[in-house]
Amino acid sequence: MRDNNAIYGGEMSAHHYFREFAYCDSGMIPWLLIIELMGRKEKKLSELVKDRQQKFPSSGEINFTIKKPEKMIEKVLKYFQDQYLYYDYFDGLSVVFEDWRFNLRISNTEPLVRLNLETKKNLDLLNHRIKKLTKILMSE
């Protein structure tokens, strides 16, 4: 975060890091921000979550055990090479398309590759892309 002057960093394990909090983990700051948003929008948390899930259906973190993860990640990128808008390796492999995106990264704490996928308002596309990526990743 310091190298990139990032304002925020987060993990699926519910760790939240903030530049203005000395780059330290805080669970209280996200809750305060959510409470502020609830008040501003005059909505319950369940309503905010439902709205977000409908706008951006997501897979959640899907874990794979893969023998040669670096090679498999390159295989995934090659498979989509004529389809994506752009990609980067900031935190694993992140690939962005017109109406969906995914991140594939090697876990730092377990022998796993983690997939997170998100679409724009399209649950069918989400399920289709999860199946496609699972098929590629399991094709060792």
Annotate the PLM regions:
Residues M1-E140:
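Phosphate-binding and adjacent anionic-ligand microenvironments
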